[in-house]
Structure formats: C-alpha cells, structure tokens
Regions:
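N-proximal low-complexity "stem/linker" segments adjacent to membrane-targeting elements
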Residues: 1-26
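Short, acidic, metal-binding catalytic loop of nucleotide-sugar glycosyltransferases
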Residues: 25-34
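A conserved acidic beta->alpha catalytic loop
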Residues: 26, 41-51, 94
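Short beta-strand/loop segment that forms part of the nucleotide-sugar
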Residues: 34-43, 65-69, 95
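Glycine-rich, basic loop-to-helix element that forms the pyrophosphate-binding segment
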Residues: 69-85
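Short aromatic/hydrophobic "clamp" motif used to bind/position activated sugar donors
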Residues: 90
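Conserved donor NDP-sugar-binding/catalytic core segment of glycosyltransferases
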Residues: 102-139
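Conserved nucleotide-sugar donor-binding catalytic segment
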Residues: 129, 135-224
C-alpha cells in the first residue's frame, strides 16, 4: 500500500506533559520534514491535550495527531499507533527524550540505501546522552547487518555485539504483522517480544553507530518501573 508520509514518529505518552515539549521542539528543528507526529496518550492525568491542541495550531511543516485511550500500557499504545500510522517507516520515540536535528534525515537516507528491503524489518540508530556521546559499544564500519537477536550475541565474555539503548525504526507493514499480544490486567510487556519474533522468522536489521536519539534516565521512567513490575 502507499503511505502519505515517509516516516511516522510515534510517541506513546503517560503523564509527560512537563517534558514532552523537548521532543516537540526537536521535531520542529528537523532537517527532513516528510513525516507525521502521532501521539497516543495512554490515559494521562496531567491533561496534555491542551498542549497538543495549541501545537496543532502552530505553523509546522508536519501534521500532529493526538489520540487518547484508557491506560493500558506502552505496548497497547504501540498497537494503536501501528493501526493509525500513515508513514512507511514507524519510529517509536519516548515522550521524555528527543531527537538530534538530523535524525529523520538520516533515517530516510538509511532507507534509501538499504538493498533487498524485503529481507529487512528496519534499521537501528544509536542513542546518546549528547549528540556526540554514548555509553554504547561502537562496532567497526559504518553499519552492521544482523538481527534483533544480536543484542544477545556475545563477542567477548562480558560484551554483547549490540548493547545498550538503541533507536529502532521499523517498516510499518512488517511491524503490523507482529502486533503485541494483549493480556487482561497486564500493562507491561517488553518490546523485545515482537523484535525477537521478527528475527526468528528471518528478518534482518541494519545497525548504525550514528546517534539520532538523546536520552537520560528518569526516576519515573518505564525502564525503572518495568524492573519493579518484573520483580513483582
């Protein structure tokens, strides 16, 4: 099928009205503009709707779509985003982080240079604490072809091939074949559930060292909260 946009920047959000503007401003600074910003609000209590209604009236080169749903967890929000996405590429970006100014330009370039696209489910950029600093291991060369399972492939006794937090970009049509399972009463499910299924079924990914996503850990972030949920 044809898509009206090259990229859907998808953001699931929950009680992030105090910080999501950082992401919005980074989208305004993008050097590439063939994208939409799709936000699924997973039952926030801090009323971000007012922010989005104001931003939708600003003169942006990209559309903003805001949808609110009953709180069901990040993966349910991603499922909703996949159903609504109008971009060929589906790039989930957390609401408390932001992108480098050339992030989407790089994503579009990676898509353009990818051979045999039918064998790939997408590609992966790097995350950093600044545009030039990352705690992640850098591999040799411009890119590395592999699968999501390379996050578990050991290259040294205490080192995996692809480590740390990464920025995953998927082909929307492929990701729609691998929606997240939904269980009654369960709100937390790791995204790796579908990434690994794609890998087991033969889909490759192309990994890049380039930093396109800036992050810092928050005390109330999903990674920390998820660890508590697993412990419980």
């Amino acid at each position: 099928m044809g898509f009206p946009y090259k990229i859907t920047v998808f953001t699931p959000t929950y009680n992030r009205a105090y910080i999501i503007e950082n992401l919005y401003r980074s989208l305004q600074r993008q050097s590439y503009t063939d994208f939409e910003w799709l936000v699924v609000d997973d039952g926030s209590a801090d009323n971000p709707r007012e922010l989005f209604e104001r931003w939708q009236k600003e003169n942006n080169p990209f559309p903003i779509r805001y949808v609110k749903q009953e709180n069901g967890g990040k993966c349910r929000a991603i499922n909703r985003g996949l159903e609504l996405a109008q971009g060929e590429l589906f790039f989930t970006v957390d609401s408390d982080d932001y992108l480098t100014d050339d992030a989407l330009e790089k994503v579009a370039a990676w898509d353009a240079e990818l051979p045999d696209k039918e064998h790939y489910c997408g590609f992966v950029g790097n995350r950093g604490t600044t545009p030039t600093e990352t705690p992640n291991r850098l591999f040799e060369g411009r890119f590395l072809d592999g699968t999501a399972l390379d996050r578990y492939t050991m290259v040294e006794p205490d080192q995996v091939l692809v480590d740390g937090e990464r920025a995953f970009v998927f082909y929307t049509e492929v990701h729609r074949k691998y929606m997240y399972p939904e269980f009654p009463g369960e709100k937390f499910l790791t995204e790796a559930v579908t990434w690994d299924r794609m890998a087991y079924e033969g889909y490759k990914m192309r990994f890049y060292n380039d930093i396109i996503w800036i992050y810092e850990y928050k005390n109330d972030g999903l990674t920390k909260a998820g660890s508590k949920l697993f412990l419980n």
